[in-house]
Design a protein with these regions (language model features):
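N-terminal glycine-rich "phosphate-gripper" loop used for MgATP/nucleotide binding
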Residues: 67-72
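A generic structural signal for short beta-strands and their flanking turns/coil linkers
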Residues: 176-178, 192-194, 218-223, 257-261
Length: 303
């Protein structure tokens, strides 16, 4: 569901100063708000969890809340403002910037700020973890979480997102399989898998990579996508399907939609939500229908 926003005149910018990129681009973001004639108040986070406290305490005073940090900062603010508060605008201040890339928000704040201020308000489902935290894009177990965990820190500092490409390459070559016990709305499915994604969005990376057909973010459902390649050839075929958005019958792909999910694995596997690492499985996930309101570029204006 998209709603045309009212004029945004006053915003709160929550900045994570631990984000190296966020520190570097903050002056550009502030200039973009100033050039747009928007009053912007900045509050810096001081510890993990502080962004949620800031949002809960101050959001009601503003027309919109913007985040400038990593995907963890976005998760905190979305969790704090679920079903309430003003819309959230995401500025890419981290390394992976999964949410910004998926929403097709430019990484340059000089472009992102005016596009979001003149864009749409999108009311969408959010995913909810067992501890109450929300996510916008999806939860992954296995290959994608390993890709994030194995990206070398020194390369992330130097090369940013490209460090994850190296982590992904290493994870694909290893192709660590696990026994998956997936419960969807009370029904149990068991498979051997290399990765499972519980997705709210059907495509990521500026719509470059898709997970499956019919995955939308405002239908009150999440979508489990299980990937089970037996060889490097299988993995390459799946990747080609994801790039072409061609999801015909494939023995290495398995899909189930639902509202409540339980992921159990043998052995325990690392997990991630919107690019942020989580404790190892088991993991519980559910949908929170139409819980989030985000600012997105108006279609056709991301360039």
């Amino acid at each position: 569901m998209k709603l045309s926003p009212q004029r945004i005149e006053r915003v709160l910018l929550i900045v994570n100063p631990a984000s190296r990129r966020g520190r570097r681009i903050r002056p550009k973001a502030l200039k973009a708000f100033s050039d747009a004639g928007v009053d912007c108040e900045v509050i810096l986070t001081e510890a993990p969890g502080h962004a949620a406290v800031i949002a809960k305490t101050h959001a009601h005073k503003y027309d919109a809340v913007f985040t400038l940090g990593g995907d963890g900062t976005v998760m905190e603010v979305l969790s704090a403002l679920a079903h309430q508060g003003p819309p959230v605008g995401v500025l890419a201040g981290g390394t992976a910037n999964v949410v910004a890339r998926t929403l097709r928000i430019p990484l340059n704040p000089a472009r992102a700020v005016p596009l979001l201020l003149a864009g749409d308000q999108a009311t969408m489902d959010l995913g909810r973890l067992g501890d109450g935290r929300r996510f916008a894009i999806g939860v992954g177990v296995g290959l994608d979480a390993t890709m994030i965990s194995e990206a070398p820190h020194r390369l992330k500092k130097r090369f940013g997102f490209m460090a994850y490409v190296l982590g992904g390459y290493k994870a694909v070559l290893r192709n660590q399989k696990f026994h998956l016990r997936l419960t969807v709305d009370g029904v149990v499915y068991e498979r051997r898998a290399s990765a499972i994604l519980v997705a709210n969005f059907g495509a990521v990376l500026n719509n470059l990579v898709a997970f499956g057909d019919g995955i939308v973010h405002d239908d009150g459902l999440l979508n489990a996508c299980v990937f089970s390649p037996d060889s490097l050839w299988d993995a390459m075929r799946i990747l080609w399907r994801m790039l072409r958005k061609d999801f015909g019958a494939d023995p290495c792909l398995f899909y189930k939609s639902g509202r409540e999910f339980r992921i159990e694995t043998i052995p325990p596997m690392i997990a991630q939500a919107d690019g942020e690492l989580l404790p190892d499985t088991p993991l519980s996930v559910s949908v929170d229908p139409l819980a989030g309101c985000l600012l997105i570029p108006r279609r056709g204006r991301t360039e």
